[in-house]
């Protein structure tokens, strides 16, 4: 303890009291570890995001990367910038992390420290004081077009199989949904949440989606349930799309079948039903799984159909890029180009086009 000198006894008393309060606060800070603080930050983060699916992912990251790591038992206030940088680099290298995986993993420690700074329990967030050399990250493996989209011949055969299935078994409403979405390119969560009021004058409004939500049980495990929420994945996801005539006809066939079965077709009624219940995203993907198996091609689900439709739109020189992105429900050009622009030609078609283009 440093010497304290004051002229008045009352001032000396206050100074001594302030000193011991400062020491007590410092001692309390030294007791804060990530293991002790994580539950408090987790509840704060849940209130901030109100997204149980995201919070389950966070909890999974905690169990995978933090729970058995000695850093969570070290006093946070004692961790230096160099300590944290070395820890982060070791995590990246030992787990062969991509850049995206690292930033997802680091959310817990970075934002926990931010919250401690806000609370006044940490003077500065040292985790925000360093950068990671990009060469440490494992490059993400690019997906081949054959894994991501239905090439032209595959799409043609897929349509034939789905149409035959729906014509022979009209109760297989998922077959109609597969056909319709090849011209819409919706997220599967948007597709299964469509209601009749969304379809008007040849256009379709996208404004809700199916969402898997999670409840954390007292023992720390998670229980899933499905619900429909009145919003899309992002604000860009709320959009109005033109319905081509062939899909409009299919919608009417679905409506006719629903009425024949005695199902409601009121404005608030769901379009795609099975046994008078809304079909789910998993149900749609089961149709794709069956069709791909019948075709003898790599397994691709609704997202492959979405990529296929959006790639076709992007390939059309008469459709503006911004219009294509609006159709997709995206605002970021990089995301759209990287994830929704693929070649749909077979190797033989590519060779033929190259011969035409590059022959001397």
What does each model-identified segment do?
Residues 114-125, 179-216:
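Short, charged phosphate-coordinating catalytic segments
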Residues 210-212, 328-353:
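Catalytic-site neighborhood detector that most strongly recognizes the C-terminal catalytic loop/helix
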Residues 1-28, 234:
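Short, surface-exposed polybasic/aromatic micro-patch for ligand or macromolecular engagement
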Residues 64-65, 95-134, 187:
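N-terminal DNA-binding recognition helix of tyrosine site-specific recombinases/integrases
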């Amino acid at each position: 303890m440093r010497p304290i000198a004051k002229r008045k006894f009352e001032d000396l008393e206050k100074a001594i009291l302030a000193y011991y309060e400062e020491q007590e606060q410092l001692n309390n800070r030294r007791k804060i570890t990530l293991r002790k603080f994580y539950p408090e930050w987790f509840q704060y983060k849940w209130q901030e995001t109100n997204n149980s699916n995201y919070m389950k992912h966070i909890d999974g990251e905690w169990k995978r990367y933090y729970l058995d790591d000695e850093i969570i038992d070290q006093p946070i206030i004692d961790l230096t910038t160099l300590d944290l940088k070395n820890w982060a680099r070791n995590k990246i290298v030992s787990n062969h992390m991509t850049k995206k995986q690292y930033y997802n993993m680091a959310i817990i420690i970075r934002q926990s420290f931010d919250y401690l700074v806000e609370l006044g329990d940490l003077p500065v967030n040292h985790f925000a004081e360093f950068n990671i050399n990009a060469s440490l990250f494992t490059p993400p493996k690019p997906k081949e077009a054959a894994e991501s989209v239905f090439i032209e011949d595959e799409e043609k055969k897929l349509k034939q199989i789905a149409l035959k299935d729906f014509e022979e078994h009209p109760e297989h409403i998922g077959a109609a949904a597969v056909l319709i979405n090849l011209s819409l390119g919706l997220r599967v969560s948007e597709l299964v949440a469509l209601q009749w009021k969304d379809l008007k004058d040849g256009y379709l409004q996208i404004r809700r989606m199916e969402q898997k939500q999670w409840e954390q049980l007292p023992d720390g495990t998670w229980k899933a349930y499905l619900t429909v929420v009145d919003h899309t994945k992002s604000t860009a996801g709320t959009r109005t799309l033109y319905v081509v005539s062939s899909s409009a006809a299919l919608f009417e066939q679905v409506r006719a079948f629903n009425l024949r079965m005695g199902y409601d077709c009121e404005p608030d009624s769901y379009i795609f039903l099975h046994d008078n219940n809304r079909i789910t995203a998993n149900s749609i993907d089961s149709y794709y799984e069956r069709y791909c198996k019948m075709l003898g091609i790599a397994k691709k689900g609704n997202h492959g159909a979405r990529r296929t439709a959006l790639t076709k739109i992007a390939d059309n020189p008469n459709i503006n890029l911004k219009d294509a992105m609006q159709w997709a429900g995206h605002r970021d050009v990089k995301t759209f180009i990287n994830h929704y622009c693929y070649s749909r030609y077979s190797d033989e078609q590519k060779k033929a086009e190259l011969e035409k283009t590059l022959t001397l």
